[in-house]
């Protein structure tokens, strides 16, 4: 399939993800987090199975829609549920497994693709794994009520479902959404373009460049794991400040380093620094905006995160083609500065309305 066609499928999937995230509060208030999690997982399993039988570009576009719809709603649902019912440690560990999945899943897919079953078998394997998880979640639906009582089920049904404009008018909501755009942009830019930067600008071998990208994802998983451990002693804001400090050092190192080893270390540190931001900002959503509207805000946070993951790497590719991939460190630094400025602005707004958590 041509690269342009692949991009179209990815964009369709991302648009479906954003649509699902924006409507997550309405869906969850009707079905509940347990059913949304189970059905979304099964929906993605069906979409992956559809990909494996695809014989045309248009059918792949069609399958991208349920894949995105399932991914968007479950992300928003679980983030809000964990932030309300569990502590910051659980939230960080939850997202730590995302980093583990990002590292392990390409290896599993490559093994299957290189076997006799080919790429179709790879998608069927992924679909089977999702279907098994979805089936377990379906069987475990009664446990949701037992875990936190009937009160939590009723609270979900009574949550406020706000329109987009009203959600973004909540003091601090727009700024926290923009923060999700900027630091998620750092994640996907590093994951998508670091290897190209290492090869084209640093003249590194393709194998070594791929390893550097793996170091970034390793750092992200490790950062979220350490965030979960540190959450027992530190507040989310303290962890965010430490993470931003690490991220600042790593971005400066990327800008000035002429040494490949230092550059690879900087990518590891970038993952270590950016990793804790996503779970900790998610965890503070009900604390900053209230449990009654947190699902609406959470859905918009996931939407802006999706915008960042689509637009930022695409713009990086365009700039890299026009100016060369040497712009990679400076491009990342711009998003780091925007994140730092956004954090200052968010804290000022929350302090003014008396909702800032220490």
Task: Mark where each language-model region is.
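Symmetry-related core transmembrane helices of the 12-TM Major Facilitator Superfamily/SLC fold
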Residues: 121-142, 329-345
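Extracytoplasmic gate region of multi-pass secondary transporters
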Residues: 171-214, 218-221
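Helix-to-loop junctions at the C-terminal end of transmembrane segments
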Residues: 20-33, 223-235, 320-321
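Helix-breaking motifs and short loop linkers at transmembrane-helix boundaries and internal kinks
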Residues: 32, 53-58, 203, 235, ...
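Cytoplasmic helix-loop-helix junction between adjacent transmembrane helices
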Residues: 63-97
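Interfacial helix-cap and linker-helix signal at transmembrane-aqueous boundaries
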Residues: 27-28, 108-117, 198-199, 230-231, ...
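Conserved MFS/SLC helix-loop-helix module at the cytosolic interface between two early adjacent transmembrane helices
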Residues: 19-58
């Amino acid at each position: 399939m041509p690269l342009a066609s692949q991009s179209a499928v990815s964009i369709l999937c991302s648009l479906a993800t954003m649509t699902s995230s924006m409507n997550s509060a309405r869906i969850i208030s009707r079905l509940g987090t347990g059913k949304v999690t189970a059905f979304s997982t099964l929906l993605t399993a069906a979409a992956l199975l559809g990909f494996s039988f695809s014989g045309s570009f248009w059918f792949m576009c069609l399958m991208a829609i349920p894949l995105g719809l399932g991914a968007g709603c479950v992300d928003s649902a679980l983030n809000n549920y964990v932030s309300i019912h569990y502590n910051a440690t659980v939230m960080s560990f939850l997202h730590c497994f995302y980093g583990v999945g990002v590292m392990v899943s390409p290896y599993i897919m490559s093994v299957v693709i290189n076997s006799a079953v080919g790429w179709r078998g790879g998608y069927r394997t992924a679909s089977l794994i999702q279907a098994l998880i979805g089936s377990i979640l379906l069987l475990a639906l009664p446990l949701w009520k037992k875990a936190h009582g009937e009160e939590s089920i009723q609270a979900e049904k009574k949550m406020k479902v706000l329109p987009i404009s009203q959600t973004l008018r909540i003091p601090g909501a727009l700024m926290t959404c923009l923060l999700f755009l900027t630091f998620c942009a750092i994640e996907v830019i590093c994951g998508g373009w670091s290897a190209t930067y290492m090869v084209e600008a640093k003249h590194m071998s393709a194998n070594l460049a791929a390893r550097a990208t793996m170091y970034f994802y390793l750092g992200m998983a490790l950062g979220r794991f350490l965030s979960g451990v540190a959450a027992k002693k530190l507040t989310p804001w303290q962890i965010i400040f430490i993470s931003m400090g690490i991220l600042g050092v790593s971005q400066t190192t990327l800008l000035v380093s002429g040494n490949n080893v230092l550059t690879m270390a900087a990518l590891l540190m970038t993952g270590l620094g950016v990793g804790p931001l996503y779970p900790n900002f998610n965890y503070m959503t009900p604390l900053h905006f209230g449990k009654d509207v947190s699902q609406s805000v959470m859905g918009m946070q996931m939407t802006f995160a999706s915008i960042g993951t689509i637009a930022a790497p695409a713009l990086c590719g365009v700039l890299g083609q026009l100016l060369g991939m040497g712009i990679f460190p400076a491009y990342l630094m711009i998003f780091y500065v925007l994140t730092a400025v956004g954090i200052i602005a968010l804290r000022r707004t929350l302090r003014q309305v008396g909702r800032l958590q220490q």
